[in-house]
Each structure stands twice: as C-alpha cells, then as structure tokens.
Amino acid sequence: MLLLISGSGITYFAFERFSMTHVFEMFTVSFLIWNSVRFYKNRNNTSGFLIPLSLLIAFLVRMSNFYVFLIPLIIKNLVKTRHRKKFSLLRNYYFIGSSIISTYFYTILSNKIYGKIIFNPQEVYGTNLSVDDVISNENSLLGLFIDIFRTSFKIFFGNEFGIFWISPIIFVGLFLILSDFKNLRKPFNLLLLMCFAQNFAIVYIWKSTAASYGFRYLYSLVPLCVLIYFQYKDKKINKYLLNYALIMSIFSNLSILFFETTEKTQLSTT
C-alpha cells in the first residue's frame, strides 16, 4: 500500500506544492473512507459521529468534490457484499446529531466567508462554465468525440503528468472498474464510476496546464483507487494490471525525483 500511495504523486504535492489542497484532499477522503469502513463493519458509533464531520472537511477543502457524499454508500455496498453486514447510517443517532452540527458549522462558515450559504463552487471560483457550454461550442457530435478523445489521451498519456506514468493507481482503478463487465451494473461499481465521471467532467471543462492536464483534479480519487485495487486483488482479476500498478509506482517515484532535481524544470531545487 505504501508503494501505491507514494507512487501516486503525493511526494510532488507534499514536498513541493504543499500550499495546495491536494494532500489535504487525500487525507480527508482517506479519513472518510476509514470512518465509513469502521461504522459499516463494526457499527462503531464514534465513526458514525465522525462521518458527517469528515464530509464537511472534505467538502470545504475542495467544494467541487461533490462525489465525497457518495463514499459512505460505496463503503456500505462493499461491506455488505464482503461481510454480509447491514447497518443503517441514517438511523444512527450519533450520525444524525453530527449531521446537524456539521450543517450548522457549514452555514456559519459560509456566511462568514462569502456572506451567504454557497453550495455551487462556481460562485467561489468565479466561473460559470459548464459541461453544456463546452458541448454546445462543438460544431458536431464527431467533433465532440474527437475533443473528448484528445483530452482523455492527454490525461492518461501526456508527457507532463499523464496518470499512466505519474499516478498509475488512478489509471488502474478506473480500468479495473471498466473492465469488470460482469459487475458493471452493481451499486458499488456504478457509484465508483459516478465518482470518476464527476472528476473527469471537471477536467474536460478546464483543460489547462494550470490543472496539470487533469492530474490535480483527479488526485483526490487516489484513496478510492487504492480501495479498488485491493478489492480486485483479492479476486485475483487482471493480474497484469495489478502488477503494472506496483512496477509503475516505482517509476512514478523516480520520475518525480528526477523532475524536481533537474535544473530546467519549473520547481527545480538548484
């Protein structure tokens, strides 16, 4: 697990871009997953109380990450499938009480910072661009598909921060889900695809070097992709893809090391 996480690009943000939110995104999403697993597996009331607080912090760190609200449902379906346990989060009094407290704190913080309660991140980021706007700018359906293909190719295999090279666990997580045709319609897989779809839509809308060609906005998916990796590792499916994740994680660590110690790179230490 340490190799997969270190090879996800975390060292780049932890040691060179620590002022950005991405390391905090990974922590909050991981914390949310951990609490969700503890609750649904052991009915841990402390975790039931911490789940709404985890959601609050994760949403405040990056308000465009709406998918975090799907994570408790993803874990619920995972635990239900693997351990045959059914615990209702919505009926847990600790969860209900914490949800009320978290909602109250969010309204206070939002009013203090923005002067009103905000749920639309576009109001924070100062943009009104949407997927519909991007699609309507294309002259034809063929042009739209070509543009999506070009963007996807750059996200996966771009020379700068292509996730195939720099964050193999994200690449593997997505393709493990897509290649599992037998279970593609199951709630666990569908919810995970929704998480990927939301982040990829954001990347498609804002195609720029400032977004590291999508890597920055996909990075918060790393904890979920690690979860996917171990879910399929137990099933012994796609061994070559799983081995690729381990090998390329080593390459990712080395590539970031060379990137940060080369004189002509943007964040060179010399």
PLM regions and their residue ranges:
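Perimembrane helix-loop-helix junctions
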Residues: 67-100, 172-184, 227
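Specific aromatic-rich, kink-prone transmembrane helix
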Residues: 24-42, 47-55, 224-228
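Membrane-lumen/periplasm interface segments of specific transmembrane helices
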Residues: 90-176, 191-203, 251-263
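Hydrophobic/aromatic-rich transmembrane helices and adjacent perimembrane loops
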Residues: 21-28, 61, 67, 166-171, ...
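Transmembrane alpha-helix segments characteristic
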Residues: 1-5, 51-55, 100, 182-206
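Aromatic- and kink-enriched transmembrane "portal" helix at the membrane-lumen/periplasm boundary
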Residues: 1-31, 35, 60, 65
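Membrane-interface catalytic loops of GT-C/OST-like multi-pass glycosylation enzymes that act
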Residues: 13-23, 63, 111-116, 158-163, ...
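Membrane-interface alpha helices of multi-pass inner-membrane proteins
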Residues: 2, 47-62, 69-74, 97-101, ...
